[in-house]
């Protein structure tokens, strides 16, 4: 596969993630868009690692590290969303400002 095709795919995924993160009003959807952004970055890491440096696996190892961090971020984010839903009965971002009492 050519480098340009993979980079265009990654740019599309990144753009969709940014658009969804900006326009999302639901916390779960915002977390999903953030994961989409991180996956686009992982595609770039693996692509550049394969294209420019075949012998060293720095991009591959770094993408595995990003996947592990993203999994922890998703678990913590979903736990926070679950806690907010239990207290506020809503997962909408604009209704969950916990600093206003």
UniProtKB/Swiss-Prot annotation:
It is found in: Plastid, Chloroplast thylakoid membrane. Its EC number is 7.1.1.-. It catalyses: a plastoquinone + NADH + (n+1) H(+)(in) = a plastoquinol + NAD(+) + n H(+)(out); a plastoquinone + NADPH + (n+1) H(+)(in) = a plastoquinol + NADP(+) + n H(+)(out). It is a multi-pass membrane protein. Signal peptide: none annotated. InterPro entries: NADH_UbQ_OxRdtase_chain4L/K, NUOK/Mnh_C1-like. Keywords: Chloroplast, Membrane, NAD, NADP, Plastid, Plastoquinone, Quinone, Thylakoid, Translocase, Transmembrane, Transmembrane helix, Transport. The keyword Thylakoid applies. NDH is composed of at least 16 different subunits, 5 of which are encoded in the nucleus. This is NAD(P)H-quinone oxidoreductase subunit 4L, chloroplastic. It comes from Coffea arabica (Arabian coffee).
């Amino acid at each position: 596969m050519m480098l340009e095709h993979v980079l265009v795919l990654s740019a599309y995924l990144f753009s969709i993630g940014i658009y969804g993160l900006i326009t999302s009003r639901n916390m779960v959807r915002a977390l999903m868009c953030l994961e989409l952004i991180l996956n686009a970055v992982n595609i770039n890491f693996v692509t550049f690692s394969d294209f420019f440096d075949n012998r060293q696996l720095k991009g591959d190892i770094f993408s595995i590290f990003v996947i592990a961090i993203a999994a922890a971020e998703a678990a913590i984010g979903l736990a926070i969303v679950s806690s907010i839903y239990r207290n506020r009965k809503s997962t909408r971002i604009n209704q969950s400002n916990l600093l206003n009492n």
